[in-house]
């Protein structure tokens, strides 16, 4: 058979195989469209488990007559209009496939009216033909979608549908998940003419527990621990269940990313790791959690049904969730359902025109619309004692720089609270010996500018680890390995409160000898200061967390060597240990390239400015370019 372009009807039915798995999939897509339209009330009518009728009625903004036929066309949407919109999705839908796919396997009736129209209009499309017929109708402002005889023209798909009770059970679960995502929307679910679920709107956070109890049951409400945790652009809130009640609540697992319901493996793994010492293998944690993240840093376009996402900083998100859940579970006196008493969230002060109904992208607002520093300070004071505040996302800073600052704040949690140090206040004295810590710049400080605090431009790299740079009007060779070692030493020199431990994805089991076990016990406080969480039981050690600079190292080899070094010293300072670690860490690059060299020198200039003014031995070797020129000119 020669290659040919598929007819539109066949292409839509193929797409329907991904989008429309069962009646519950139709309900999910249509209800999400209603939410994107700004609806505050949604009525759902189901007959025969969705096989005969699915009707969704809302009071959203509606669809104009001119757009009605286009709404049923494939790849037609009001949610996005450019690649920039796709990379910062906040609306539930964006592909423009759902209505076209549904109409290709059913008889679909769409009735809608906008506030500007004096009358409503109705569009009808059926099966393979998909010709859209439009006629006047009576309808209030909003939309009603009726899907009749689902899969009537695809017998194979209809044959795989389960019993009426089973299919409605899946619909009920979808509605429950959506109701947990949008407390501000009233949702009614009817089956065969009977009211099955009625979720009243609860815009006030103080009323959220009412809906939580109606969906998850009083048992979950009784054992729920409130969680509210923030760091930089990451925010997580919701409830986790007391591990003691997990055996009765194993089915209660609801997770949302930017209010989009998810079944993401990374999130589930982080939560499971937080519960690992409190549950046996047969038990499952119970939770209702909401993760808010800059939409630029999460890709929702990776799953046909949008059940999974891909995070650009997956490790950071995993560790953030792990720490948040662990902190709540470790608080023995954690208050139950400590819901904020503040009222409704104020209406957004700015929105893009195509996002009015879909929601606010707080990460792309103009500077004038953002809270002042004073307002943010007041908000932090009012927040829960468990909430961790961090500087707001700034659009004029590249995100990778923001992410680097965020990692450094995780590494040194108090740095962001310290006053910034001006470049003029940085001492220009010669660099101390490696046993003395390199002075660290606070995270609030801007990058240093000018020749006094810059090595110069990287011209090229000589493998494996030497960079040719412009230096003080000439050129010089710089050892990237030595620069990396000094940077590691600066990162490992702990502040007064110690380095922040970063949980490992999987705890590491290490076999130790008697001397290493003794060293672990004698230097327990020092290890904690260095961000290393190591517990010893019956001759075996379990490594649960290390500081950020150690995350990429071969810990199975490094930790025994570290304990062997500690066993030779009764007293040792954190700075001395940081120096030892810096000399024993493996390099992140066997062979360097120009971009890696530039990134390294940028970090060194930021954290170790003294190395620029007084390079230590072995770091920099100026090249006598004048002598070479003289040779070439025969002078």
From Swiss-Prot:
CDD domains: HATPase_MutL-MLH-PMS-like, MutL_Trans_MutL. Residues 364-377 have a biased composition (Low complexity). The keyword Lipid metabolism does not apply. GO terms for molecular function: ATP binding; ATP hydrolysis activity; ATP-dependent DNA damage sensor activity; mismatched DNA binding. Residues 359-399 are annotated as: Disordered. GO terms for biological process: mismatch repair. The keyword DNA damage applies. Keywords: DNA damage, DNA repair. Gene3D superfamilies: 3.30.230.10, Histidine kinase-like ATPase, C-terminal domain, MutL, C-terminal domain, dimerisation subdomain, MutL, C-terminal domain, regulatory subdomain. GO terms for cellular component: mismatch repair complex. Signal peptide: none annotated. It comes from the Bacteria. Residues 378-399 have a biased composition (Basic and acidic residues). PANTHER family: DNA MISMATCH REPAIR PROTEIN MLH, PMS, MUTL (PTHR10073), DNA MISMATCH REPAIR PROTEIN MLH1 (PTHR10073:SF12). This protein is involved in the repair of mismatches in DNA. It is required for dam-dependent methyl-directed DNA mismatch repair. May act as a 'molecular matchmaker', a protein that promotes the formation of a stable complex between two or more DNA-binding proteins in an ATP-dependent manner without itself being part of a final effector complex. NCBIfam families: mutl (TIGR00585), PRK00095.1-1 (NF000948). Belongs to the DNA mismatch repair MutL/HexB family. This is DNA mismatch repair protein MutL. It comes from Yersinia pestis.
């Amino acid at each position: 058979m020669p290659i040919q372009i598929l007819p539109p009807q066949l292409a839509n039915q193929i797409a329907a195989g991904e989008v429309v798995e069962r009646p519950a999939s139709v309900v999910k897509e249509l209800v999400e469209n209603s939410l994107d339209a700004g609806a505050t009330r949604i009525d759902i009518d189901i007959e025969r488990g969705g096989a005969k009728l699915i009707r969704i009625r809302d009071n959203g903004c509606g669809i104009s007559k001119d757009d009605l036929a286009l709404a049923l066309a494939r790849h037609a949407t009001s949610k996005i209009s450019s690649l920039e919109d796709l990379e910062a999705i906040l609306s539930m839908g964006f592909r423009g496939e759902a209505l076209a796919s549904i109409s290709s396997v059913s008889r679909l009736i769409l009735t809608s009216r906008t506030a500007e129209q004096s009358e409503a209009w109705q569009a009808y499309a059926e099966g393979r033909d998909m010709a859209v017929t439009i006629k006047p109708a009576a309808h209030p402002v909003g939309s009603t979608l009726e899907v009749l005889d689902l899969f009537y023209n695809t017998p194979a798909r209809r044959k795989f549908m389960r019993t009426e009770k089973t299919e409605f059970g899946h619909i009920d679960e979808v509605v429950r998940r959506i109701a947990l995502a949008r407390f501000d929307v009233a949702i009614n679910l009817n089956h065969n003419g009977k009211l099955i679920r009625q979720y009243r709107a609860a815009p006030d956070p103080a009323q959220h527990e009412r809906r939580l109890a109606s969906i998850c049951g009083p048992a979950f409400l009784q054992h729920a621990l409130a969680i509210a945790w923030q760091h930089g652009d990451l925010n997580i809130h919701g409830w986790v269940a007391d591990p003691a009640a997990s055996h009765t609540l194993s089915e209660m697992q609801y997770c949302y990313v930017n209010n989009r319901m998810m079944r993401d493996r990374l999130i589930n793994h982080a939560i499971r790791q937080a519960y690992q010492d409190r549950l046996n293998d047969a038990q499952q944690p119970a939770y209702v959690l909401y993760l808010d993240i800059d939409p630029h840093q999460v890709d929702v376009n990776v799953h046909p049904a949008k059940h999974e996402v891909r995070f650009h900083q997956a490790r950071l998100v995993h560790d953030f969730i792990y720490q948040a859940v662990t902190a709540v579970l470790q608080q023995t006196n954690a208050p139950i359902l400590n819901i904020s008493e503040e009222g409704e969230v104020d209406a957004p002060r700015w929105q893009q025109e195509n996002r009015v109904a879909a929601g606010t992208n707080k990460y792309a607002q103009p500077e004038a619309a953002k809270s002042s520093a004073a307002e943010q300070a007041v908000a932090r004071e009012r927040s829960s004692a468990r909430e961790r505040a961090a500087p707001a996302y700034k659009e004029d800073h590249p995100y990778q720089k923001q992410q680097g600052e965020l990692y450094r704040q995780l590494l040194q949690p108090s740095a962001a609270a310290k006053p910034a140090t001006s470049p003029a206040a940085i001492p220009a004295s010669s660099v101390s010996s490696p046993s003395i810590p390199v002075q660290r710049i606070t995270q609030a400080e801007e990058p240093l500018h000018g020749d006094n605090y810059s090595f110069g431009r990287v011209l090229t790299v000589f493998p494996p680890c030497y960079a040719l740079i412009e230096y003080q009007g000439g050129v010089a060779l710089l050892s990237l390995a030595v620069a990396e070692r000094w940077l590691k030493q600066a990162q490992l020199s702990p502040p007064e409160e110690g380095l922040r431990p970063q949980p490992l994805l999987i705890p590491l089991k290490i076999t130790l000898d008697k001397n290493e076990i003794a060293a672990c016990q004698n230097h327990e406080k020092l290890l904690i200061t260095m961000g290393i969480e190591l517990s010893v039981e019956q001759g075996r050690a379990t490594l649960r967390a290390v500081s950020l600079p150690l995350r990429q190292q071969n810990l199975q080899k490094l930790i025994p060597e570290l304990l062997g070094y500690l066993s030779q010293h009764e007293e040792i300072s954190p700075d001395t240990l940081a120096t030892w670690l810096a000399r024993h860490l493996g390099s992140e690059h066997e062979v360097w390239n120009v971009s890696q060299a530039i990134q390294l020198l940028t970090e060194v200039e930021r954290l170790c400015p003294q190395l620029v003014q007084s390079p230590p031995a072995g770091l920099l070797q100026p090249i006598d370019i004048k002598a070479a020129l003289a040779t070439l000119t025969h002078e």
